[in-house]
A protein has these predicted regions:
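Active-site metal-coordination segments of metallo-dependent hydrolases
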Residues: 189-197, 256-258
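Non-catalytic architectural context of zinc metalloproteases
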Residues: 1-111, 129-132
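Juxtacatalytic substrate-recognition/specificity segment
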Residues: 63-192
Length: 471
């Protein structure tokens, strides 16, 4: 932005048509209306440039609602181009979720006003395609396709907004100098994405079991899925090294693992803290202590954080970080699960040839229309037998050419392949055309599930589990 003016106050005037209103957590200092020309001017004043970037504003035709949760006013603004959804449609699920989050967080969150800005994209037009959300201190912006069904939209909002709301804790309240003085032109990354994104993602799941929104098994299944996803990445790379270098070519493709193994680091640390404190202290208590020590206006030095965590908790926590966060040792999940009376069990389950449930093994290039096998994921037994590699471009399957336009034909035809029939897939691998052949066979993948051990109700492990999930 304007050079060397990051710490100066800003006054922003926005001229808007009268039929559009602002959705934002900012309160306008003035609002000048001119009924003669059907335009009005909203004026906002903030203390420094960061506050400009930290307060998104969405102007749209009025579709807003609000509710109060334990002293916090929540604003919900929705833009739905065809009018398929309204703020009132979405309000019940959001209100239930944020009420549970506020109860879970307790006194760590003193935000007085919070805005949720939902932009629903029209896929029939040249509209937004980057779906997801971005957190701010007092608001979250969300972009999702309007084509979603109501139940699907509610579920996405629950998962996405809950994650973003928990960013109130970190990095918004607890963060390093790299975050506080972030230079968008020359970004320097922190070592602690395990906390900023990993712990946040863990909280977004933990609060749901803690507040009774999901069952114990639902929570275990989510953690199991994260373990499986994390195994598609190098499990020996120190997480702090990856985090600090996440923008480099070597590590940029590992960012998704921040939400997988990062959350699992949070889970393992939570269990270890519960074990050392006889169930009294968990990772939320740690984040409250860090928030009190630092807060949004006092960043920490990157290299000091782990030492501060050890000082605020137990000396034994140092070895946890030395092994599993700054070290190269993979987390022995079974050992941590055993502490709380859980165990992992593996079994083989059936999949489709090109789909594992809702997760595809193939993707498409919108520009070229080409189909290719995805990189960074594990394949089923059939694709492994076939010799498929991530990045292989599909030319033909059993003599038929396939592109994005007829990909569903590929899925459908594969469902009728007979056991033992000959399958031939021609792929382009690094510019070389290769023919892959195999006999059709039921594709399978190994699935690991987390289950509760059969233990008496008064078992110390059961009590520790209850403290971990419900306290």
């Amino acid at each position: 932005y304007f050079s060397k003016l990051q710490e100066e106050p800003y006054r922003i005037e926005i001229l808007r048509p009268d039929n559009l209103i602002a959705g934002t957590s900012l309160t306008p200092t003035t609002k000048d209306e001119n009924p003669d020309d059907n335009f009005s001017t909203d004026t906002y004043t903030v203390g420094r440039y960061f506050e400009v970037t930290d307060h998104p504003i969405m102007y749209a035709k009025p579709d807003t609602t609000s509710f109060d949760v334990q002293g916090m006013k929540v604003l919900l603004d929705v833009y739905s181009p065809t009018g398929k959804f309204s703020a009132q449609d979405i309000k019940p699920g959001i209100e239930k979720m944020i009420s549970a989050q506020k109860k879970f967080l307790g006194d760590i969150n003193d935000t007085e006003k919070y805005a949720i800005l939902l932009y629903l994209s029209d896929l029939q037009k040249k509209d937004a395609r980057g779906f997801g959300a971005l957190e701010h201190h007092t608001s979250t912006t969300v972009v999702l396709p309007e084509t979603m069904q109501k139940a699907q939209l509610d579920e996405s909002m629950k998962d996405v907004v809950s994650h973003e709301f928990f960013h109130i804790v970190t990095p918004l309240s607890v963060h390093s100098n790299e975050i506080h003085y972030f230079d968008y032109n020359d970004p320097k990354m922190s070592q602690h994405l395990w906390m900023y994104e990993g712990v946040t993602e863990y909280f977004a799941n933990l609060f749901q079991i803690n507040q009774g929104l999901i069952s114990n098994q639902d929570f275990y299944d989510r953690m199991s899925e994260k373990i499986a996803s994390s195994m598609n990445f190098d499990d020996t790379v120190p997480f702090t090294v990856m985090s600090e270098n996440i923008l480099t070519d070597q590590y940029k493709d590992s960012y998704y693992n921040v939400y997988q193994k990062g959350a699992l680091i949070g889970m393992a640390l939570d269990i270890r803290l519960r074990e050392l404190s006889d169930g009294k202290i968990g990772i939320l208590d740690l984040m409250k202590k860090l928030s009190k020590k630092y807060g949004k206006d006092k960043p920490f030095n990157d290299e000091d954080l782990i030492g501060d965590i050890v000082a605020l908790t137990y000396p034994e926590i140092q070895s946890f970080f030395d092994q599993y966060v700054t070290g190269e040792t993979p987390i022995p999940y079974n050992q941590f699960f055993a502490k709380v009376g859980l165990e992992e069990k593996s079994s083989m389950i059936n999949t489709g040839y090109f789909l594992n449930g809702q997760v595809p093994y193939i993707d498409g290039d919108p520009a070229s229309g080409e189909l290719f096998f995805r990189k960074g994921i594990g394949f089923n037994t059939f694709l492994e037998k076939l010799g498929v590699e991530g990045g292989d471009i599909i030319k033909t399957v059993n003599g038929t050419e396939y592109t994005i336009k007829n990909v569903y034909g590929l899925i459908t035809s594969s469902q009728s392949w007979e056991e033992g029939s000959d399958i031939e897939i021609v792929v382009d691998r690094d510019g070389e055309e290769i023919t892959l052949t195999a006999k059709a066979s039921q594709p399978q993948v190994e699935e690991t599930s987390i289950t509760e051990m059969e233990l008496p109700a008064d078992s110390p492990k059961v009590k520790l589990r209850e403290a971990w999930l419900k306290n």
